[in-house]
UniProtKB/Swiss-Prot annotation:
Upper lineage: Eukaryota, Metazoa, Chordata, Craniata, Vertebrata
VCA: annotated segments: 359-481
Described function: Acts as a nucleation-promoting factor at the surface of endosomes, where it recruits and activates the Arp2/3 complex to induce actin polymerization, playing a key role in the fission of tubules that serve as transport intermediates during endosome sorting.
Any one GO molecular-function label of the UniProt entry: alpha-tubulin binding
PANTHER family linked: CXYORF1 (PTHR23331), WAS PROTEIN FAMILY HOMOLOG 2-RELATED (PTHR23331:SF5)
Family: Belongs to the WASH1 family.
UniProt-listed Pfam families: WASH_WAHD
Record's keyword annotation contains Glycoprotein: no
Species annotation: Danio rerio (Zebrafish)
Descriptive protein name: WASH complex subunit 1
Length: 481
């Protein structure tokens, strides 16, 4: 028996359905019908079995998820009634596999029963004689695909014709390196040069279209306003947090743990905040460097001038500086009222301790510079430029110290007076011109000796202005008289 089957395949279809051919003998047709029904029964049984297995598998997975949910609910219910604090640790990763399982069809691994060999059955009946008339009659009823679209005789194809079926992309539809569709309009075109040579019929039928006018933005040189793009970036903001005034401890509350206390300092929060200055790490300090730096800092602090300009530090050679001169320098001013007298005494006595502390500081600094000290000593022995008579540095510094104390006393006594302010301004200008301002006094002990320029000599020659103390005292006597 020769069995002819026709198979219809679809995408993803595993099984093939046999079709029974016409014009078969009765016995042969019965055998093919029986085989087709048995084949259909086997296919349906296999399909329903696979569907049932898939449903059962999904049901088991759903049951496992339900059991996990019930277990979690039971644990939550158990924790609810407890008054003890419970720590719950959550996994850092989402409980899912790194790679999701791909979908698999239920027909994977299925075998088509038609591919199996079947026993051959011998047909006893004879073949029918061929009838040409019956064959011709059957041909009359066969479906024939007829193109019902009528084509006019006047219509002429302008391009290459209809699109082929094997066109997969737009690049294969258009001419290379151009935008010309040759199936719609055929042109002679060099893709590299860009020159177009059209056919004679195309030139006759095509109408010349003038280009459109340029837009107003080009003809009138107008510029369109550029719209600023909106910013959709998320900026976290804490916003307004309501202040709730509640007591720190509420006893006997249901469902609240009573064996755990929280402190106010819980560490950095998740909200945006200004970085604190305490977050800067402290660098470790070394022993020797720290001692040296601390010593140098103390020296700088001692040498730094306070708001009232202090006297310059004395040279390292003299160590027996008499303390009484500050007291004697404060005595000459006229006797003011008792309260200013206490202020004067305190001002006069206050510079004494810094002088003692400042004495020792330069001696420590000058010790290592033996070469410079020997050079200065040789210059002093030589007599300077032209063997000029050098004044004693100690005397000059004592005179300047007395002069500054007199200025301070005058400023404190006649504070707020127009003449005293003018006197102070003139004194400051003289110091600025001579280069002996308060900024250059605390630099080093050798600064006054080295600043022997022309301006310094001129400022020494100019006598200082008289202090306005006597005039103020005379005015007071006149008012009392």
């Amino acid at each position: 028996m020769v069995r002819m089957t026709q198979k219809r395949y679809l995408e993803g279809q595993v099984y093939s359905v046999p079709l029974i051919q016409p014009d078969l003998r009765r016995e042969e047709a019965v055998h093919q019908i029986t085989d087709a029904l048995q084949y259909l029964e086997m296919i349906s049984t296999d399909i329903f079995t696979r569907v049932s297995e898939s449903v059962e598998k999904n049901r088991a997975h759903l049951q496992s998820v339900t059991d996990r949910i019930k277990l979690a609910q039971a644990r939550v219910q158990k924790i609810k009634g407890s008054k003890k604090a419970t720590k719950v640790f959550s996994s850092a990763k989402y409980p899912a596999p790194e790679k999701l399982q791909d979908y698999s069809s239920i027909f994977t691994g299925a075998v088509d029963p038609a591919s199996q060999k079947r026993p051959r059955i011998k047909v006893q009946s004879k073949l029918r004689p061929l009838d040409d008339k019956a064959q011709q009659e059957k041909l009359m009823y066969l479906p024939v695909c007829v193109n019902t679209k009528k084509r006019s005789e006047d219509e002429t194809e302008e391009g290459l014709g209809s699109l082929p079926r094997n066109v997969n992309s737009v690049s294969s539809l258009l001419l290379f390196n151009t935008t010309e569709n040759l199936y719609k309009k055929y042109v002679f075109l060099d893709p590299l040069a860009g020159a177009v040579t059209k056919t004679h019929t195309t030139l006759e039928t095509e109408k010349e279209d003038k280009p459109f006018d340029a837009p107003l933005s080009i003809t009138k040189r107008e510029q369109l306003e550029r719209q600023t793009a909106e910013n959709y970036f998320y900026v976290p903001d804490l916003g307004q947090v309501p202040e709730i005034d509640v007591p720190s401890y509420l006893p006997d509350l249901p469902g609240i743990a009573d064996d755990l206390m929280y402190s106010a300092d819980l560490g950095p929060g998740f909200a945006p905040s200004v970085p604190a200055s305490n977050s800067i790490p402290e660098l470790p300090s070394f022993g020797t460097d720290h001692d040296e730096s601390s010593g140098s800092d103390s020296q700088f602090k001692l040498e730094a001038p306070p708001p009232p300009p202090p006297p310059p530090p004395p040279p390292p050679e003299p160590t027996h500086v008499p303390v009484p001169p500050p007291g004697t320098s404060a005595a000459p001013p006229p006797p003011p009222p008792p309260p200013p007298m206490t202020a004067d005494n305190t001002d006069a006595s206050s510079p004494a301790p810094p002088t003692g502390t400042v004495k020792g500081a330069p001696s420590e600094v000058v010790q290592p510079s033996n070469g410079r000290a020997s050079l200065l000593e040789s210059i002093r022995n030589a007599g300077g430029i032209g063997k000029a008579n050098l004044r004693n540095v100690k005397e000059r510094k004592m005179e300047k110290k007395k002069q500054k104390e007199q200025e301070q006393v005058g400023a404190t006594v006649s504070g707020g007076d127009l003449m005293s302010d003018l006197f102070n301004k003139l004194a400051m200008r003289r110091k600025g011109i001579s280069g002996k301002g308060p900024a250059g006094q605390g630099d080093s002990s050798e600064a006054p000796a080295s600043s022997g320029g022309a301006f310094a000599r001129m400022s020494d020659v100019i006598p200082p202005l008289p202090a306005p103390q006597q005039s103020a005292a005379d005015d007071e006597d006149d008012w009392e008289a």
